[in-house]
Design a protein with these regions (language model features):
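Cofactor-binding active-site loop characterized by glycine-rich and histidine/acidic residues
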Residues: 27-31, 35, 42-43, 47, ...
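Glycine-rich phosphate/pyrophosphate-binding loops
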Residues: 80-85, 211-223, 556-582, 602-604, ...
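A glycine-rich helix N-cap at a beta->alpha junction
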Residues: 116-129, 244-255, 285-288, 590-610
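N-terminal leader/propeptide and maturation segments of large enzyme subunits in energy/redox metabolism
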Residues: 124-127, 131-133, 137, 359-362, ...
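Thiamine diphosphate
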Residues: 149-190, 199-203, 213-223, 232, ...
Length: 851
């Protein structure tokens, strides 16, 4: 240090200069001209869809065409997909993910072309090697279904006097298939519900890790396609870390279409002004194995990249990505940016939507370049737009057929059908795995509520690879008087799940997994694809959306060749209840995928740990009050939400939900809410319902009416502090002459599945007009539907004053939420005292409305 006190230190600056090296790749032999012709036909077909339906996307799908065609037709030996168009959902096929979902017209076009090639070859030869089930295939008639609903398509031909038109004869096979605006997992080879928010791509890490965990052959892979704008989203940014953390290696291969063009503007130079925003370096910095291409609209470069990924070292556990420069609005018939007739090619964000008028100048220029290439002539396109619906449909189908007639030229259709059969025959029906692909372990009867061990037990777990054995203690039910909160039971139910299913319950939670008590659920520690494939606890960062997406990726896979049986894993992701909305969007998309899936998939779980106002202890402000209620925002019957208050509710309630989900494909999500504090385990011998498995019924009676006294109404309780304090207040309320029925609300979804006689005995519909609620939740979402008009006025909720709580100690927060014992006593006492007046008010209101 100098005399005046100054000093110098050394700091370091990171450079933004690119560090990319060139390497030569031996281009494999492949049918380039065939791929180019299929690519041109694909582009023309998707443009016909846009032209006649006047909707959809144009620039992105055309930019994707070389990626999609090459990945499907280059062949497994060159790094292309191993798939079978005839059995598109075969469990042992490679997974293709059109994550950039609005680009799906390029796949609809390609799938129609493939379906037509096989259908024509089968018709010509009668050889069943070319037979594809029309129920799964796509055909020319499906061009009428682009962006139309299934209901409308059932009557579209009759409504337009086309039912008997020769052009529409194909509809008689199985109708017209609805082609959605974004990619969905129902679509042939596609295995993702894709969209522009990056949600689709984010599940890819879980899909890849699933194969490693199942001990599958390393040749099985995931190929996912997305664009650079979607990959700026939070989901996909977290996906970068997810894939690296799971060390998926070359099993995961992303093809990035980089054209610096979004919906409205450019990314670099507009959204990001500085040209230092370098995508390849970003992915490399995250730990990915990055390949860049100067022109990903060139088939040689795309196939070279696919081959390079295929030949890469399997010991390199970095996931792989190709950052390929494309042209949004790419057109194979354009020359130096010009189309026939001196029309300038439309590219970049201006080409995003299909915005050209029907049969307008630009469409005609595109069509003429196709006509010149293949020697065909489209009908009616030079006569202007078609306003009559019947004539428009006729012209659409006519010109789709003309475009597809290219398959009959120069042996293109023969080549394509043979190529599809050749690739399809490489899908292995008997893939070696470390697990039985024919048995669903979640149907094991040891998981039924009635068969759960009611006492603490020690089981012997055996490592399925090494044969090592170890004792595991599991306590699904605690003794009354023990001091344990509901969160303490979470690891116990996961341990039992993994013991019974032999390590098929996967945990994907952040580095607070110990805090939310999922840590010991894995019997064999952390998963690693090289050193510990039977571990079920994944290393994960604090990435709620990414973790949930990875969990969904796991559950979306199945080993079963029977589409009605799921053989795979279930998964759980969790965090503090306040943060779980970050997990909602991936699970919302998952719910729809589960609903529509052509094959059974697994069950995804969300743990809303530290829920309720109790989370705000230690003066924290992240309350789990409103946030966990997003898990009610699903179609009824597709999610089971469990809100536990007592340790002994957890196993009974959860395994009741699991029993349903394992047998009802509609249920794809189970949500569990647990609070942070430890409470004394309740003595159920003092309850009206003494059944130790009462939580399995959803709602159960803690205190029933005294039959010898006037009834004062029903108190429905949900949440930990609320119910614990209510139960402890009951003796004082009884001394005060209060005669209420107290119902514990664990899960309305479970309650709704009980016999009508049980529901009427616990909470009949009429009782809802004489009901108050005590809950750690809010007045915005009640634990039971159909509450009476005065329920809100008399209930206790954490948002009683419509304000955010301020935090403090646990006691401070509960008092502020008006869920302390004194507040509960006063509220229930008032509810009882005003019973007659309350009922009279409702009767008067009803009579007044009726008069």
């Amino acid at each position: 240090m100098s005399p005046n006190g100054s000093s110098t230190v050394t700091i370091h600056s990171a450079k933004t200069t690119p560090a990319i090296t060139d390497r030569s790749v031996q281009l494999p032999e492949y049918d380039r001209e065939r791929l180019e012709d299929i690519g041109f036909l694909t582009s023309m077909t998707l443009v016909l869809l846009g032209n006649y339906h006047q909707t959809g996307h144009f620039g992105g799908p055309t930019a994707y065409a070389p990626y999609t065609v090459a990945s499907h037709l280059a062949g497994p030996e060159n790094g292309g997909l191993t798939f079978d168009y005839r059995r598109p959902k075969h469990p042992f096929a490679d997974r293709f993910m059109l994550a950039g979902g609005h680009n799906v017209p390029v796949m609809y076009a390609l799938w129609i072309i493939m379906g037509e090639a096989l259908d024509r070859k089968h018709t010509e030869t009668g050889d069943d090697r070319y037979k594809a089930d029309p129920k799964t295939s796509m055909l020319a008639i499906d061009a009428l279904g682009f962006r139309r609903g299934a209901g409308a398509l059932k009557t579209i031909l009759e409504e337009n006097d086309l039912a008997d038109h020769p052009l529409m004869a194909q509809a008689g096979i199985r109708g017209i298939r609805a082609l959605a605006g974004h990619s969905e997992s129902t679509d042939l080879t596609n295995d993702v519900n894709g969209g522009p928010s990056g949600i689709g791509i984010a599940t890819a890490a879980g899909k890849a890790a699933f194969w490693d965990m199942m001990g599958a052959d390393p040749s099985l892979k995931i190929i996912a396609i997305e664009g650079e704008f979607a990959l700026t989203s939070g989901h996909s940014q977290e996906f970068k870390t997810q894939a690296v953390a799971q060390r998926v290696g070359k099993r995961l291969r992303v093809l990035l279409s980089y054209n610096n063009a979004g919906i409205d503007d450019e990314l670099i130079g507009s959204v990001v002004k500085e040209d230092t925003y370098r995508i390849a370096e970003q992915w490399s910095a995250y730990g990915w194995n990055v390949i860049t291409l100067d022109d990903a609209n060139d088939y040689d470069q795309v196939v070279a990249a696919l081959k390079a990924m295929e030949d890469s070292d399997p010991a390199d556990r970095r996931p792989m990505i190709v950052v390929g420069k494309t042209v949004k609005g790419f057109w194979p018939g354009a020359t130096d940016g010009m189309l026939p007739g001196g029309v300038t090619q439309v590219i970049s964000n201006a080409s995003h939507a299909y915005g050209m008028p029907m049969n307008g100048e630009y469409f005609v220029a595109l069509a003429e370049s196709f006509e010149q290439k293949f020697g065909v002539t489209f009908e009616g396109i030079r006569d202007g737009g078609v306003t009559d619906t019947r004539e428009r449909l006729i012209q659409l189908k006519t010109n789709i057929d003309i475009a597809l007639s290219v398959l009959d030229k120069n042996g293109l259709g023969d080549w394509l059908s043979e190529r599809l059969v050749e690739i399809g025959d490489q899908v292995n029906d008997d893939l070696p795995l470390r697990v039985d692909p024919d048995t669903d372990p979640f149907l094991d009867e040891r998981l039924l509520v009635k068969n759960l061990p009611t006492e603490a037990t020690t089981v012997t777990a055996e490592h399925p690879i090494t044969g090592e054995k170890k004792d595991v203690s599991i306590t699904l039910f605690e003794q009354p008087g023990a001091v344990k909160g509901t969160r303490r039971a979470i690891s116990e139910i996961i341990k039992w799940m993994n013991y019974v299913t032999e390590n098929r319950f996967v945990i994907v939670a952040a580095d607070l997994f110990e805090s939310i008590n999922v840590d010991s659920g894995s019997l064999w520690g952390h998963y690693d694809p090289v050193d510990n494939i039977v571990g079920t606890r994944l290393k994960a960062a604090i990435q709620e959306a990414g973790n949930a997406s990875t969990a969904v990726g796991f559950t979306s896979q199945s080993l079963s060749k029977d589409p009605n049986k799921h053989v795979g894993v279930w998964s759980i992701s969790g965090t503090y209840g306040a943060f779980t909305p970050l997990m909602y969007l991936p699970l919302r998309v998952w719910s729809q995928q589960n609903q529509d899936s052509p094959f059974r998939v697994g069950v995804a779980h969300i743990l809303a740990g530290h829920s309720g106002p109790e989370t705000a202890a230690d003066a924290r402000t992240h309350f789990g009050i409103f946030s966990p209620q997003v898990w009610k925002l699903f179609p009824k019957g597709q999610v089971i939400v469990l809100s536990f208050w007592d340790y002994n509710d957890v196993a009974a309630g959860y395994f009741a939900a699991a029993e349903i989900a394992a047998r009802d494909p509609k249920v794809g999500i189970i949500v569990m809410e647990v609070a942070r504090p430890d409470f004394t385990v309740a003595d159920r011998t003092k309850f009206a319902d003494t059944d130790p498995h009462a939580a399995a019924k959803g709602f159960y009676v803690i205190r029933d009416f005294d039959p010898d006294k006037p009834r004062h109404g029903v108190v429905v309780s949900q949440g930990s502090s609320s119910t614990v304090n209510l139960v402890s207040t009951l003796p004082k309320l009884e001394e005060a002459g209060v005669n209420v029925k107290v119902v514990a609300a664990i899960s309305e979804e479970l309650f709704d599945r009980q016999p009508q006689s049980y529901r009427d005995s616990v909470l009949p519909e009429a009782a809802k007009f004489d009901m108050m609620v005590v809950t750690t939740g809010t007045r915005r979402v009640w634990p039971v539907t159909g509450v009476g008009p005065l329920t809100d006025e008399y209930s206790l909720t954490s948002d009683w004053d419509n304000q955010w709580l301020t935090g403090g100690t646990e006691d401070d927060v509960i008092k502020e939420a008006h869920l302390d014992k004194d507040s509960i006593f006063n509220a229930v006492k008032r509810f009882a005292d005003e019973h007659d007046a309350r009922m009279s008010r409702q009767a008067a209101a009803f009579n007044g409305a009726s008069s």
